[in-house]
Amino acid sequence: SYSSTPGAEAPEKNEKRVKQYAMMQKIQKFGGAMFTPVLLFAFAGIVVGVGTLFTTEAIMGDLAKPDSLFYQCWNVILQGGWTVFNQLPLLFAVALPIGMAKKQNARCCMEALVLYLTFHYFLSTMLSQWGTAFGVDFSAEVGGTSGLAMIANIKTLDMGMIGALAISGIVIWLHNKLYDTELPDWLGSFNGSTFVFMVGFFVMIPVALISALVWPKVQLGMLAFQGFVKGAGALGIWIFILLERLLIPFGLHHILYSPFYYDNAVVPGGLYAYWATRLPEIAASTASLKSLVPEAGFTATGFSGMVPLSILPAQ
């Protein structure tokens, strides 16, 4: 009996390890798929940086006055550069199926786009009619602390990257389950993506209702977290960088920093977009970067490889 016990436990341990490995692979795959839109930041960031430089009067002088042809031409280019930053949730919704769909990835991207917009049309209409019941002032201006945003010209709740990934994840699950469903011949035109859209259309109604009930409370929590992070100063940055370094060996660091960089965890719209919008003010000011954009310290994760974590809070 003594010798049989290890043999009986070994398959269970191996099975547990296989499941853990499979789960880790899925999480890493999710992190990689989530990172896809970020690849566009390299070029878009250069365009925004150069465009901001040439449209900042404090740097270019009279050449960058708003009524000059030089300014107006560069402003056209600058506004085009904002595409990635302004439509980031939409990009996350479309990009996730590229790495997560098990079949017909391109069709799944289309389904995710259409159902993501459908979700926001449902949510927008619910809030416009019953906003007070959900604790949302839908008449407020978009941005600031209103909790509202414009997604593809739809006034809706600002659910940022988290909302986009959640809706896209639901669509991916529906796509993987339903895409190959064989309908009767007389319903043949509803096969494939059309069937996924049909089912997803009705799924989005309760999802929108739940979002209207829950997300305003989540936003209050995020505002409180933003206040805590800003108040923590260097200690908050140290904790963030420490966690990021600990997660790198597991390939999970994208999941930690994405809400900071691309979502509303610290500032509305994410740190990168926030930084880009503040560039003219920063360029025209003689104040220290720390006083102008204290939140930018969270983007200094790359310095942790050169500077010991033990001394970062002292900076």
What residue spans do the PLM features occupy?
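Pore-lining transmembrane helices
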Residues: 1-184, 195-315
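Juxtamembrane/start-of-transmembrane alpha-helix segments at the extracytoplasmic/lumenal side
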Residues: 191-193
